[in-house]
From Swiss-Prot:
Family: Belongs to the XseB family.
InterPro entries linked: Exonuc_VII_S, Exonuc_VII_ssu_sf
Entry superkingdom: Bacteria
Protein name: Exodeoxyribonuclease 7 small subunit
Quaternary state and interactors: Heterooligomer composed of large and small subunits.
Pfam families: Exonuc_VII_S
Compartmental location: Cytoplasm
Enzyme Commission number(s) from the entry: 3.1.11.6
Signal peptide positions (record): none
BP term (GO), one: DNA catabolic process
Catalyzed reactions: Exonucleolytic cleavage in either 5'- to 3'- or 3'- to 5'-direction to yield nucleoside 5'-phosphates
Length: 78
């Protein structure tokens, strides 16, 4: 039985590194206009995904803080 390799899950840090690489390619001056637009579009899409990820994580942190505050109130009731 062969094992399938798991695809690496999306990672914020890797996405930011990808955007930095795309920006470096754009700034190099070695691409033609069509390639510049393509790289710019890739960077914009990746940054949009990063923003969505950060918003999701912000909401998760807010929920955790609310739970901790509730737990603290419960302990103070004793």
């Amino acid at each position: 039985m062969s094992r399938r390799k798991r695809e690496d899950p999306w990672r914020y840090e890797a996405a930011i590194a990808e955007v930095e690489s795309l920006i470096a390619q754009i700034e190099s001056g070695e691409l033609d206009l069509a390639e510049v637009v393509e790289r710019f579009q890739q960077a914009a899409q990746t940054l949009k995904r990063c923003a969505e990820f950060l918003e999701e994580k912000r909401q998760q942190v807010e929920i955790l803080i609310e739970e901790l505050n509730q737990d603290d109130e419960d302990w103070q009731a004793f």
